[in-house]
Amino acid sequence: MKYTSAQANKLLKKLNDEYSALLHKEQRSRDFRAAMGEDIESVRPAYDYAKTQARLEELEGTIRRLKHAINCFNTTQVVDGFGITIDEMLVYIPQLTKRKSKLLEMKSRLPKERVEEQYGQQSNIIDYTYTNYDLAAVEEDYEKTADELSRAQLALDTVNQRDSFEFCE
């Protein structure tokens, strides 16, 4: 069956949720307590070891194959307008996000700011911190980075919704 990356990731989430729920259910039912004199069979939870292990192994195999298919797709599919693979884009977007955050902090500074504390304590000495960069250049770089980040995210969203790959469950 053909899946887009977005569909495959939704399926992966569903499989992981089912796997976690089954593990949790197994943990709650694989052993149990009974009071002295209580009929053990009346409080025994339903649990089939062989059936549970078989389903867990089946889910593990499907999850493994699906992750591999997604990884293969991500390392070979090129993102339009960028000339890099999805895999590279998944590294590039956090880099842009980090750069944007740094530039936001830099562009928010005043050229000269009074320092209120020194070494975590109030000081009677008047001290100033000065920016050592061109604020206009930082603001320009911030706008370019924010635009590039938006463009990258939209391009990645497009390829994840449009292009598909084959995966057999």
For each of these PLM feature ranges, what is it?
Residues 1-169:
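Structural preference for solvent-exposed beta-strand-turn elements
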